[in-house]
Amino acid sequence: MRREIAIILILIAIAIACCGCIRKPQEGGIATTKIKIGVMPDEATLPYYVAAQEGIFTNHGLNVEIIPFQSAMERDSALIAGEIDGGGNDPVSVALMRNAGYDLKIVSLGLQATPDKMRFAILASPASNISSVADLNGKKIAISRNTIIDYITDTLVGDTAVELKKVEVKKMPLRLQMLLNNEIDAATLPEPLASYALYKGAKLVISDSMLNRTISQTVIVFRADFLNNNSEAVNEFLAAYGEAVKRINANPEKYRALLVEKTHIPPEIASNYTIATYLQPQVYPETDFDTVIHWLQAKNLLHRTISYEDTVWRGE
């Protein structure tokens, strides 16, 4: 009898101890949720780092781990493998992954070009005589095929008679090096590499900020399985992101050092580099989605229907 009582007491003690292991709610009653976010070393990631370092994620009941990647391929592989839950991405990549059968959702628009701040540019080599889009006709341009870079290149050239000789150079540092060494006529580069190339003598042919419409946008994505099970946490994530955006836009210089550190902006241009104006979380526009899908269809890169309704999450 005593032994039975002792066993019961032990079981009660274990049960009480386990109760202490249950996730405790933060202030406001929000349970702590772990989210793994994958990021690239580009300026679109700054709000994530600000929200993490200034405790904004924590205040929203989130435990966010930011995982850096050096290539989009590595980031996307981690996303579809379930090693990360979401993060920054681009609409071309998202559409191609959905086409391959991976259920990802765009939960918000991210960063985009503005009239005073480019995100992508076509640049000519320092020794070239290229000064306009028309001058690109028949010239070799370094890109990465079937990516946002390829999409931006085609869109910047537009409906002209210009025929480009596209050269596959996936690694952006190599693309930059070939451009500056005059080994290629032109290249399409993202920021901050585009600004650095200009600093080193490359010539600006055209950038996305020179157009009268927005063509280059980042998006925030999550795996559908994570989103379905953690919709409240994703809403809190976007709210925290929005708070970080407010702080950055209110005092961008305060975050210059963090931006330089996380995006590897070359020291030669770090002090004068234009900091982007960040957007509040918002639904990714259907018109922009359709433009990307039409481009992918024209290149025969889609073998299934990729609909706006299935791809874009409107919140709950």
Q: What do these predicted ranges mean?
A:
Residues 12, 53, 153, 256, ...:
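Generic structural marker for isolated residues within well-ordered, non-membrane alpha-helices
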Residues 59, 113-115, 211, 279-286, ...:
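Short, solvent-exposed loop/beta-turn-alpha elements that line the ligand-binding surface or hinge
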Residues 304-316:
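Hinge/cleft segment of the Venus flytrap/periplasmic-binding protein
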Residues 92, 166-258:
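Pocket-lining segment of extracytoplasmic ligand-binding domains
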Residues 228-303:
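Secondary-structure end/capping motifs
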Residues 42, 70-73, 88, 143, ...:
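Soluble non-cytosolic domains of exported or imported proteins
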Residues 1-28:
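Secretory targeting signatures
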Residues 29-161, 166-169, 185, 191, ...:
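Short, glycine-/small- and polar/acidic-enriched structural segments
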